[in-house]
């Protein structure tokens, strides 16, 4: 295993976290108000080598702390296993790509070994711990109707297709990913090419199909699936906490 300095993380060379607003981050716990770019404006390729992403890579190579990485820095100080530790442990086999980093921080090869994409805020529930940013249902209380926020870059699917062979793990969340047609489209693309990355989900487990497409028919094409169910309570308490949930229908 490669030995890394304390402020170095493999994430900017192996990962991108894209939110439903189009905001792009080097990872999902990078400071939420410090996106490196927005793919609705710049696309995946533009975000991969945006000015802020290039600056972040150079800071890490110089072992300089970055404000956006404060959560991992705090975890490390407390002896808690951080995302930084996760990336450096699980993706150190991509270190040769780090060596290709140019003087301005550019990395020519877009490598999304771990791809975290949140296509939209489309959701069938209105959890008390959530809000309109992550649930279209919450917008009903604010503007009287659901407001769907979604990635809308015109070249998104072409760019995703180009990077598919580099993906080792896809993380789906939302909104509710199993409620989104884009989620099934991405799985179709992977299946058509015979690609089998790990699939990781954060789901409310209330529905496993969409318009006749059942998730079990998709999952049988993949070898590793991690399905994390978001539950706070059970029974009536669960229905109270997660408005729209019927406990008897939870998978």
Kindly give the residue locations of the regions a language model identified.
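Accessory C-terminal segments flanking Radical SAM cores
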Residues: 1-93, 97, 111-114
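Generic structural signal for small/hydrophobic residues in well-ordered secondary structure
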Residues: 19-22, 44, 72, 119, ...
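Non-transmembrane alpha-helical segments in soluble domains
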Residues: 45-48, 70, 127, 131, ...
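Short microdomains enriched in Cys/His and/or Lys/Arg
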Residues: 47, 88-105, 113, 142-160
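Short pre-active-site segment immediately N-terminal to redox-active cysteine/selenocysteine motifs
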Residues: 68, 76, 122-126, 131-134
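Core AdoMet radical
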Residues: 112-122, 131-152, 165-180, 193-211, ...
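Short amphipathic alpha-helix with an adjacent loop that forms part of the alpha/beta core around
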Residues: 156-163, 213-219
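Distinct, well-ordered alpha-helical segments
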Residues: 184-188, 210-218
């Amino acid at each position: 295993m490669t030995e890394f300095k304390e402020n170095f993380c493999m994430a900017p060379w192996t990962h991108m976290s894209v939110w439903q607003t189009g905001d792009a981050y080097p990872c999902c716990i990078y400071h939420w108000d410090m996106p490196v770019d927005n793919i609705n404006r710049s696309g995946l390729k533009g975000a991969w080598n945006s000015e802020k992403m290039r600056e972040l890579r150079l800071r890490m190579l110089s072992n300089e702390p970055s404000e956006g990485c404060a959560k991992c820095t705090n975890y490390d100080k407390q002896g808690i296993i951080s995302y930084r530790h996760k990336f450096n442990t699980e993706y150190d086999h991509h270190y040769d790509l780090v060596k290709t980093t140019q003087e301005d921080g550019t990395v020519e090869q877009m490598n999304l070994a771990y791809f975290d994409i949140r296509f939209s805020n489309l959701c069938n529930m209105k959890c008390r711990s959530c809000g309109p940013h992550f649930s279209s249902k919450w917008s009903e209380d604010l503007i009287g109707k659901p407001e769907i926020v979604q990635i809308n870059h015109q070249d998104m699917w072409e760019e995703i297709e180009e990077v598919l062979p580099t993906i080792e793990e896809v993380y789906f969340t939302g909104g509710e990913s199993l409620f989104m047609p884009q989620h099934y489209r991405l799985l179709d693309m992977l299946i058509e090419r015979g690609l089998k990355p790990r699939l990781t989900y954060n789901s409310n487990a209330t529905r496993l199909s969409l318009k006749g497409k059942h998730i079990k028919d998709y999952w049988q094409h993949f070898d590793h699936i991690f399905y994390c169910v978001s539950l706070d309570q059970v029974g009536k308490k669960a229905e109270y906490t997660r408005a729209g949930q019927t406990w008897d229908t939870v998978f």
